[in-house]
């Protein structure tokens, strides 16, 4: 992930989780640190900030940033998130984005981590029913929308954000949330209508977006933290009032990060071999025999010329007393990836370690990165090299990858200027914690009459999770899988106030529904009471003409078991202690 500009170009914090939690800093030190934060702008700097703010408003900017830059050696992104969101507030919309960037030689810690909480506005869509909540204006409206994606786009069209120097090259504020796989039904209304969708057994939103005015960005290279508050001028009677209120809101945000009563994070030791698969997952949305029958049916469609490929998935279920945030902390160790995310949304919590972009738009350049073709990592650099050549000589995997590159070119071409679509990189091998993937990069220049939302609509869902031809493959997925996919194989990420977009593909993503259940268990010990959570781990396999049903089923099991290792680690570290 080269940029979460939006930039989920964020990174796991490098300090140990136990440090920076305030346990080694007395009350006096905390107060001193807090005071230093508020006094870092002298009178001249304050006047300059106010002058730039008012000048921006006079020029027509109606959403303007105020920011402070502080030392980050007393905080980690994980701790900062816990400062902003209480441990027991698991339904409060909020997020933590981090990243480990991949390359041909291995991994590098991404430069930025981004934390956000308390969105000023939310949009929740379920089929065509949309609820818009403006928490700042204390208003709520419900409406029918043929295409709910047009609502955040229309709201953004009213904004003229001020561009100021000193903001990091990362996501600094805007929309954050998820788009389910089923949002394709807003576009393909005739062939994939909601009325013909499979069973919706979880009743999760199809879209959830929060508008985050308060953002904390960790710069792991320069060892500092940017604390940012965006001011909506239209919510105030005057520019002076807007500036004063914005300044107070920013200081309140800083105060929460430097609270005297800094929350503590549960310490833990890594007792498991994180490179191994997790325990076998027994409960699935499809039995082994049903999945194998679906593979056979898919191959019949392929041999008949109906499709070339289809991705068939199944949803596994696991129950755990580990908290979703504890699972996220474990996942950072088990499977560091370009798009690490802990996202509390309406109806569910997403814990993700996605390796793949769904779509990115940065300064009107569209990026699509098909990731298809997989082989395990070697135990040494020499073995990695041997396995890399083995992967690139696998005709089946390479042919499948080229087909998906063509799909990516088609998706980008729908919204790009004529002649601007390019394959920047073709058939590169990227190394991840457990596997290597074949990767390509497709780019294009967004047409002048379109926005990033159009690029997202054209891409969602990508061919690597649906098939080819895409729409026909999705019709067969509806028939064969039997359940709505929800967040799996959709996307999560954000759209900045500047109109840049970075959306990750929701693979290697655990979904924790937050709705109440009648069969939830509780564990009571001397230390605490724990609630049982249901974790959904969904995985799929690309079916082609020579696919073997047993192998494809095992691929699903392996992918889900790799993700389940994070739950194993969270349980052994935080629950079994």
UniProtKB/Swiss-Prot annotation:
Question: Does the UniProt entry include the keyword Metal-binding?
Answer: no
Q: What class of enzyme is it?
A: lyase
Q: Which keywords does this Swiss-Prot/TrEMBL entry list?
A: Amino-acid biosynthesis, Aromatic amino acid biosynthesis, Chloroplast, Lyase, Plastid, Transit peptide, Tryptophan biosynthesis
> How's its activity regulated?
Feedback inhibition by tryptophan.
- General function of this protein: Part of a heterotetrameric complex that catalyzes the two-step biosynthesis of anthranilate, an intermediate in the biosynthesis of L-tryptophan. In the first step, the glutamine-binding beta subunit of anthranilate synthase (AS) provides the glutamine amidotransferase activity which generates ammonia as a substrate that, along with chorismate, is used in the second step, catalyzed by the large alpha subunit of AS to produce anthranilate.
Among NCBIfam families, the record links this protein to: trpE_most
**Protein name, entry field:** Anthranilate synthase alpha subunit 1, chloroplastic
Species of provenance: Oryza sativa subsp. indica
Query: What gene is this protein a product of?
Result: ASA1
